[in-house]
Amino acid sequence: MAAPGEIILEDVPASVNLFRTLQDQVTKVTAHVQALTQKVRSGIYNTDKGLSFLELKDQLLLFYLQDLTHLMLEKTNGKSIKGNPGILRLVELRTVLEKMRPIDQKLKYQIDKLVRASVTGSLGENDPLRFKPNPQNLISKLSEADEGESDSGEDCAESGNAKKPQSKVKKYIPPRLAPVHYDDTEAEREHRIIERAKKLALSSSTIRELKEQYSDAPEEIREGRAYHMMRHDKEEQHRINHEESMMVRLNMTRKEKARKKRVLAMTSQLNSLTHFSDISALTGGEGRTDDLVPSVKKSRKGPKKSKKRKGFRKRH
């Protein structure tokens, strides 16, 4: 094991190199700080509207370096630092600086943005604050002179003495809906009605029962509810879910109200016991398509009541 004196002799060259490097760095930092101080005092760098947080951080770092330099000077002179008040000040300053680090991280974006704006004179193109609502955009882009000219132009146009001047900003004119000729033929209409009848026939209870009878799949046992009621409940649940998720009330058309009334009436009446769905659209026959064609309401014309002219009764 080497003696303590030998260890100290081995560390002397490394210590000398560190002191030389430290001296060079201190010289550079001193020159840089003096240049900044001169610019601030001459008014080149205006620090009147600076951030108090950064000013406090700079003051704490300066105090920390002063106490640290004082302790290094005491140790270099061979004096003991035990009980030195500078140690307690260093611990206190280090604690405050550590507590300020989360705040520094939160303010980093705002500080960098302000520094960049002060250097370049404008914000970045991708800065999110460029897309925020700007109340200045609500102000009319026309100057008072242009507005006065437009008002005078309208007055002249009404009187007929002069033509209306063309303004740079044109008024918005909504597009007009042009009438379109209805080119639907009778054959296309019949084909559409037949397709609708096939769709209704495939969803009928008769086809569903035949499918369950001849299918090899296991029979699915449901509650004692009709197929049309199950379909109605499914549509009603979908409607409720849409209203609750979108926070909006859906209005029912007259056609939907009539269908709902018809479905509810089928469950409360016994007339539908012997009623079977029309599946002639699947077999090629001519089924009833009267229910698929929208009915045209006819106005009821009754006998007109004769209106007698009321007058004053003569007194005898």
Curated annotation (Swiss-Prot):
Main location per the UniProt record: nucleus
Pfam families, per database record: Sas10_Utp3
Chain intervals with Acidic residues compositional bias: 145-157
InterPro entries: Sas10/Utp3/C1D
GO BP term (any one): ribosomal small subunit biogenesis
Basic residues biased stretches: 297-316
GO cellular component term of the entry, any: filopodium
UniProt subcellular location: Nucleus; Nucleus, Nucleolus; Chromosome, Centromere; Cytoplasm
Keyword entries, A-Z: Cell projection, Centromere, Chromosome, Cytoplasm, Nucleus, Repressor, Translation regulation
Region (Disordered): 143-172, 280-316
Source organism superkingdom: Eukaryota
PANTHER family reported in the protein's UniProt record: NEUROGUIDIN (PTHR13237:SF9), SOMETHING ABOUT SILENCING PROTEIN 10-RELATED (PTHR13237)
Family according to the record: Belongs to the SAS10 family.
Complex and partners: Part of the small subunit (SSU) processome, composed of more than 70 proteins and the RNA chaperone small nucleolar RNA (snoRNA) U3.
Function: Part of the small subunit (SSU) processome, first precursor of the small eukaryotic ribosomal subunit. During the assembly of the SSU processome in the nucleolus, many ribosome biogenesis factors, an RNA chaperone and ribosomal proteins associate with the nascent pre-rRNA and work in concert to generate RNA folding, modifications, rearrangements and cleavage as well as targeted degradation of pre-ribosomal RNA by the RNA exosome. Its dissociation from the complex determines the transition from state pre-A1 to state pre-A1*. May inhibit mRNA translation.
Official protein name in the record: Neuroguidin
